């Protein structure tokens, strides 16, 4: 199948560090399946500068064709295609005979709608922002609404986004599906590439929980680990909406917990002043983040405004009891007290959740880990890409 993938949320160069690679993972998996995928990155220049995104001149970069526009695609977007790119002129573009166009983020969706080719619209938190923020009411909201009506299908990046979109536009129900991301198999302890695939589920589960010990007294059975105090981890770029301060305040004064914070940003000095006992590591390479997760007991990040949240899946795969925000991000995959915990994004709720985890019985903790293990097996990058593609095939 020939797919044209359109989005500005895509690394132009393979060594680019600042752009999320979640959409890249879908493309890579589809290519492994034998499909041809061309990537078109339409870039609204002003938006690029306002958001501090990397800027590249228009042209072909490895497998990405980057096109810059001063205006947000008001005019004929096709006029900038040139014969030097892999996409070529408009005539050449049509000759590619793309079976489907997959477009993500507001700019990608608006651009795809301009092309006049059948497309799937991928909904992120940014799209919900355009549809609900009064600042976009006059111009962008009507254009995005029109594009969504024209889309053959709508792929929401999380269950939360699906529910938010359908609350706004219930008429889209028959063409909406959820397209979550999945973790790389190497990121999960039980899916390590070196692991013998013949191991049973029980063997895998024992490896998954190998760093956890359970009290044998179920009447007084608290969470006991090889770590004393209990190791709590959070990881994010220090933005206000990540609510790192709420985690620090929740742990402050709780002698049974030790908090480590991975990340950096403008808020760091303020955060460090809240509690001198918190361990700040700064930014770490991805493999070191995973190592920290595997050496922790609880991962908590009560952020808001998340499209999805790969870090939660990675924490679950690393054997952490994982806490996310209720009604945001990965809620719907994480189910409260079943395979993780949901919390309100305030320090009192986070503190209460941590104490609830500490007081889990042996049976409750065992059930939690079993369910978490079973959940994560369904969210690898390969499986998620396959399910996304299956949904696309349904509309063709």
Tell me what each language-model feature is.
Residues 1-53:
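N-terminal subdomain of nucleotide-sugar transferases
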Residues 4, 155, 200-202, 226-242, ...:
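Conserved donor-binding/catalytic core segment of Leloir-type glycosyltransferases
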Residues 18, 84-85, 118-120, 128-146, ...:
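Nucleotide-sugar donor phosphate/pyrophosphate-binding loop at the beta->alpha transition
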Residues 160, 182:
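Carbohydrate-associated surface elements
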Residues 269-287:
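Nucleotide-activated donor-binding/catalytic signature segment of Leloir-type glycosyltransferases, i.e.
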Residues 282, 336-337, 341-348, 356-362:
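Conserved acidic donor-binding segment of nucleotide-sugar-dependent glycosyltransferases
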Residues 304:
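Aromatic "clamp/platform" in nucleotide-sugar-dependent glycosyltransferases that forms part
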Residues 321-324:
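Short hydrophobic beta-strand element within catalytic cores of glycosyltransferases
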């Amino acid at each position: 199948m020939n797919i044209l993938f359109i989005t500005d949320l895509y690394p132009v160069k393979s060594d680019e560090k600042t752009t999320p690679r979640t959409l890249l993972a879908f493309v890579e998996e589809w290519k492994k399946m034998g499909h041809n995928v061309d990537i078109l990155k339409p870039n609204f220049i002003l938006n690029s500068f306002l958001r501090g995104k990397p800027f590249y001149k228009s042209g072909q970069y490895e497998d990405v064709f980057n096109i810059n526009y001063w205006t947000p695609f008001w005019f004929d977007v096709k006029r900038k295609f040139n014969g030097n790119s892999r996409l070529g002129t408009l005539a050449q573009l049509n000759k590619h005979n793309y079976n489907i166009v997959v477009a993500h983020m507001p700019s990608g969706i608006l651009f795809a709608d301009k092309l006049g080719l059948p497309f799937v619209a991928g909904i992120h938190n940014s799209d919900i922002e355009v549809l609900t923020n009064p600042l976009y009411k006059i111009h962008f909201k009507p254009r995005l609404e029109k594009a969504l009506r024209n889309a053959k299908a709508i792929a929401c990046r999380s269950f939360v986004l699906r529910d938010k979109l359908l609350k706004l536009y219930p008429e889209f129900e028959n063409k909406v599906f959820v397209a979550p991301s999945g973790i790389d198999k190497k990121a999960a302890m039980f899916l390590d590439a070196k692991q013998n695939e013949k191991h049973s589920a029980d063997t895998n589960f024992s490896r998954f929980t190998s760093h956890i010990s359970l009290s044998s007294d179920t009447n007084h059975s608290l969470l006991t680990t090889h770590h004393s105090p209990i190791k709590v981890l959070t990881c994010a770029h220090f933005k206000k909406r990540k609510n790192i301060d709420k985690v620090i305040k929740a742990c402050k004064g709780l002698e049974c917990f030790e908090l480590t914070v991975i990340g950096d940003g403008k808020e760091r000095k303020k955060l460090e002043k809240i509690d001198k006992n918190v361990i700040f590591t700064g930014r770490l390479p991805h493999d070191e983040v995973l190592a920290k997760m595997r050496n922790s007991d609880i991962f908590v990040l009560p952020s808001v405004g998340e499209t999805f949240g790969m870090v939660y899946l990675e924490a679950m795969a690393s054997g952490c009891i994982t806490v996310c925000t209720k009604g945001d991000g990965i809620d719907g995959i994480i189910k409260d007290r079943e395979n993780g915990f949901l919390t309100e994004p305030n320090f009192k709720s986070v503190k209460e959740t941590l104490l609830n985890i500490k007081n889990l019985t042996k049976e409750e903790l065992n059930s939690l880990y079993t369910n978490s293990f079973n959940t994560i097996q369904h969210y690898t990058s390969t499986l998620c890409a396959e399910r996304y593609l299956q949904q696309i095939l349904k509309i063709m």
